[in-house]
C-alpha cells in the first residue's frame, strides 16, 4: 500500500513576514492520518485551526490566503509547495502571525525543515485526486488547465517584458516522473520590481521584502549581487507557486497542469471548478505502490530523486 506521510518530530523556526515585516514563529508538528495540512493561529486569544482547502482560500491578490472565522494565514504557497514536493499528507503548522515567514523567498527552507524533522509513513492509504476530464479557467489571455494524466506534470508560461527575464526563458515543462522537485524547483525565489516594492510599501505591504528573500529587478537588470540560482529561476518560481496553490485541494493531483500567466487567483479558481464537477475527478489509492505513477510525491523510499 502506498501510505500517507507526516513528519517524525516537531521542528521550529523563526522568520519575518513578507508584508508585515514582523517576526513570526513557525512550528511544524506531526499529525494523524487523514488530518491534512492544518494551519493554527496560536497567537490569537482563542487559537483558530484553518485546514488547507480550496474553499478556504479568500484573498489571492499577492499570495494564497486561508481564511476562517475572521482569522487569516497568508503566503502559504511556498510551504504547501514543499509539502507537495516531499509527499507530506498530514501536518500541523503553528504560526504566531497572519503570514507564514518568507524565509529566503523559495521553498528551500521548508524542505530543509521537513527533512530535518524526518518523514514518517503512516498506516493509512495515501489518497490522490485523479483528474478524469479536462477543466479550464480563462481570464482574458490568461488560462490554467488540468487534463487527465497518470502522474503529475506541469507546463507554465510567463510573459514579463523585461530584458533580464527575456534572457532566462519564459516557458518551462516539468514531469515529476523524471525531475527532482528538491533539486530543480525548490530553490527558486520570488521576484519583484523595485518600483512596485516602493508602491507596496506606501500601502503598508512588502515591509519584510529585501534582496535576502527575493530577486529584485530595476527597469533593466537584476539588482541582487549573487544573481540567479537557476538559469530560468523566474518561471521556476511561478511553477513552485502553482505546485503549492494546487496542493491546497487536499491531496496530490494525478493530472497535467498547463498555465499561461496564471497566478494564485486563477489557480484557486481552477481547483474550485474541478471540485464543482464531481464527474471530472475521483479519489484513488494504490494497494500496490509499484502500480502508482512515478513522481515526486509517490516514491516510497524518498520523496525526491
Swiss-Prot record:
Needed cofactors: Zn(2+)
Disulphides: none
Keyword Lipid metabolism on entry: yes
A Pfam family that the UniProt record links to this protein: LpxC
Gene Ontology biological process terms in this record: lipid A biosynthetic process
Known catalytic reactions: a UDP-3-O-[(3R)-3-hydroxyacyl]-N-acetyl-alpha-D-glucosamine + H2O = a UDP-3-O-[(3R)-3-hydroxyacyl]-alpha-D-glucosamine + acetate
Pathway this chain belongs to: Glycolipid biosynthesis; lipid IV(A) biosynthesis; lipid IV(A) from (3R)-3-hydroxytetradecanoyl-[acyl-carrier-protein] and UDP-N-acetyl-alpha-D-glucosamine: step 2/6
Tagged with keyword Zinc: yes
Enzyme class: hydrolase
Key words of the record: Hydrolase, Lipid A biosynthesis, Lipid biosynthesis, Lipid metabolism, Metal-binding, Zinc
Domain of life assignment: Bacteria
EC number: 3.5.1.108
GO molecular function, one term: metal ion binding
GO cellular component: membrane
Chain sites annotated for binding Zn(2+): 78, 237, 241
Active site: 264
Classification via InterPro entries: Ribosomal_Su5_D2-typ_SF, UDP-acyl_GlcNac_deAcase, UDP-acyl_GlcNac_deAcase_C, UDP-acyl_N-AcGlcN_deAcase_N
Functional note: Catalyzes the hydrolysis of UDP-3-O-myristoyl-N-acetylglucosamine to form UDP-3-O-myristoylglucosamine and acetate, the committed step in lipid A biosynthesis.
NCBIfam families with a match to the protein in the record: lpxC
Family affiliation: Belongs to the LpxC family.
HAMAP family to which the protein is assigned, alphabetical: LpxC
Protein name: UDP-3-O-acyl-N-acetylglucosamine deacetylase
Organism: Paraburkholderia phymatum (strain DSM 17167 / CIP 108236 / LMG 21445 / STM815)
Gene: lpxC
Amino acid at each position: 500500500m502506498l501510505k500517507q506521510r507526516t513528519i517524525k518530530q516537531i521542528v521550529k523556526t523563526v522568520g519575518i513576514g513578507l508584508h508585515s515585516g514582523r517576526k513570526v514563529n513557525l512550528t511544524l508538528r506531526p499529525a494523524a492520518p487523514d488530518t491534512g495540512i492544518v494551519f493554527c493561529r496560536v497567537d490569537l486569544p482563542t487559537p483558530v485551526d484553518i485546514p488547507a482547502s480550496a474553499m478556504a482560500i479568500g484573498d489571492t491578490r499577492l499570495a494564497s490566503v486561508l481564511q476562517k472565522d475572521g482569522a487569516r494565514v497568508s503566503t502559504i504557497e511556498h510551504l504547501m509547495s514543499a509539502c507537495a514536493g516531499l509527499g507530506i499528507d498530514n501536518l500541523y503548522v503553528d504560526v504566531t502571525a497572519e503570514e507564514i515567514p518568507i524565509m529566503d523567498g523559495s521553498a528551500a527552507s521548508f524542505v530543509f525543515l521537513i527533512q530535518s524533522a524526518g518523514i514518517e509513513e503512516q498506516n493509512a492509504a495515501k489518497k490522490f485526486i485523479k483528474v478524469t476530464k479536462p477543466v479550464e479557467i480563462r481570464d482574458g489571455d490568461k488560462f490554467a488547465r488540468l487534463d487527465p494524466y497518470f502522474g503529475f506534470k506541469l507546463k507554465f508560461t510567463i510573459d514579463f517584458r523585461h530584458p533580464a527575464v527575456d534572457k532566462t526563458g519564459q516557458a518551462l515543462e516539468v514531469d515529476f516522473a523524471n525531475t527532482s522537485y528538491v533539486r530543480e524547483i525548490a530553490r527558486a525565489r520570488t521576484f519583484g520590481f523595485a518600483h512596485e516594492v516602493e508602491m507596496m510599501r506606501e500601502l503598508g505591504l512588502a515591509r519584510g521584502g529585501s534582496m535576502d528573500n527575493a530577486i529584485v529587478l530595476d527597469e533593466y537588470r537584476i539588482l541582487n549581487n549573487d544573481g540567479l540560482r537557476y538559469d530560468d529561476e523566474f518561471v521556476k518560481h511561478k511553477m513552485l507557486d502553482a505546485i503549492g496553490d494546487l496542493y491546497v485541494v487536499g491531496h496530490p493531483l494525478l493530472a497535467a497542469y498547463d498555465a499561461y500567466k496564471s497566478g494564485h487567483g486563477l489557480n484557486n479558481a481552477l481547483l474550485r471548478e474541478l471540485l464543482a464537477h464531481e464527474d471530472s475527478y475521483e479519489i484513488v489509492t494504490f494497494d500496490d505502490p509499484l502500480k502508482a505513477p512515478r513522481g515526486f510525491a509517490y516514491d516510497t523510499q524518498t520523496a525526491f530523486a
